[in-house]
Amino acid sequence: MRSLIIAVDFDGTVVEDAYPRIGKPQLFAFETLKALKQERHRLILWTCRKGQSLQEAVEFCRENGVEFFAVNSNFPDEPLTPEDSPKIVADLYIDDRNLGGFPGWDQVWKMLKPDDELPEEEMRSKGIFQRLFG
């Protein structure tokens, strides 16, 4: 599979929706994101958060082992003016607000890698109870 640019929403997708607070991580969210990065896909955090709330989300992801290529832009430190479109150019958008809702990270992985399972080391990094109940 070729390398993809994947725009990923935060609230309701990476974590349970608890905005403005940060919800609990969605089941397999960080395991899947790490595996996608290992597959050399470019991940962009694509969220409505801004200011301090955005920084908290970025830091939360970093603390959970996921560093995004860019945040709310196509490239790191991309200068945006009010005339620029805020739309992120991506091959794939992962968001809880898409048609049909968010299918879950296990289904995201199966859609992208139908013949593969998540890498075992990612699955074993947390016990089943911790993955299910945080």
Please place each PLM-identified region on the residue numbering.
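HAD-like aspartate-dependent phosphatase fold
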Residues: M1-G134
